[in-house]
Amino acid sequence: MSFNAFASSLSKKLQEISTSVSEKTQELPSLAQSTQRMVQERLGQVTDISQLPREYTELEDKVDTIKLIYNHFLGVTAIYENGSYDYPKYINESVNEFSRSVASKLTELTHATSASEAQNILVAPGPIKEPKTLNYALSKVALNSSECLNKMFPTEEQPLASALLQFSDVQAKIAQARIQQDTLIQTKFNKNLRERLSFEIGKADKCRKDVHSMRLRYDVARTNLANNKKPEKEASLRVQMETLEDQFAQVTEDATVCLQEVISHANFSEDLKELAKAQAEYFETSAGLMKEFLSNSFAEEPEAKPEVAEEEKPQTAISMNDEDDA
């Protein structure tokens, strides 16, 4: 690149920066006036406030309600993203497991004979961890209890040990069903609500800010024109007010369309249906597994009818005959 071309390019860049700075500088008085106006309105010092169309304010209220519902539900259903929500004890167990893992690696490192071997020990993955859920904890404790009974009485059949083993298997299956429920809720409920909050409602919030910002600027321009005491400025102030009035009307129209789109896409009944379906499938699976376990492991035997002693039968007959004679 020649020096002249470089100089020309540099001059152009400097001109663009100068223009940008000039524009920002010109905006400062307007921004200061808008900020002052906003404070005055909040303090009740200004009552001449341009009213937004009723259709628009009703749309704002509807979108606020949708946003409130989404946020309130997510405040609860976000718990499904924490696998141990039904087993808080796992925190202590995780600390103990981490300590054991560190101790094990330190022991292995003391026996390493080379730097590469030590590196392999450090990067080697740890044991596969079971999900820290209540059902998995029940499955584990039932399995351990079954093994203890079998070791204590190796030559005897242990119905309780067998029942514990079956209970362990059932709890593991229920744990898997719960994890499946959590995954469905995360992907088909939480994710959908968050995406709408981030994109559609986020876009609507920006449009609403533009409307209220433009309304402030328009009201400032109206006030400036009304309070003007210099005839030579009246024409320019009127043009400024009319320009801002048109811009205010345009951003309000654009925001109205945006708010309507949010409302039309907010099919929360379908989201609620997905949440209920995930829960129903989990509850049905869990109930079915538990009923099957109870039926197989604790089948109730029919109660035996009490036998009537032979010597009591004639006595009963005699008693009845005595009543007839009476």
From Swiss-Prot:
Cross-link type Glycyl lysine isopeptide (Lys-Gly) (interchain with G-Cter in ubiquitin), residue numbers: K13, K305, K313
Note: Present with 7721 molecules/cell in log phase SD medium.
Membrane topology: Peripheral membrane protein
Keywords, alphabetical: Acetylation, Golgi apparatus, Isopeptide bond, Membrane, Phosphoprotein, Ubl conjugation
Keyword Nucleotide-binding: no
Primary subcellular site in the record, as a coarse category: Golgi
Compartments reported by the entry: Golgi apparatus membrane
Record-listed Phosphoserine modification sites: S2, S319
Species, as recorded: Saccharomyces cerevisiae (strain ATCC 204508 / S288c) (Baker's yeast)
Name of the protein: Protein GVP36
Residue numbers carrying N-acetylserine: S2
UniProt biased composition (Basic and acidic residues): 302-314
Region (Disordered): 299-326
Name of the coding gene: GVP36
One Pfam family this sequence matches: BAR_2
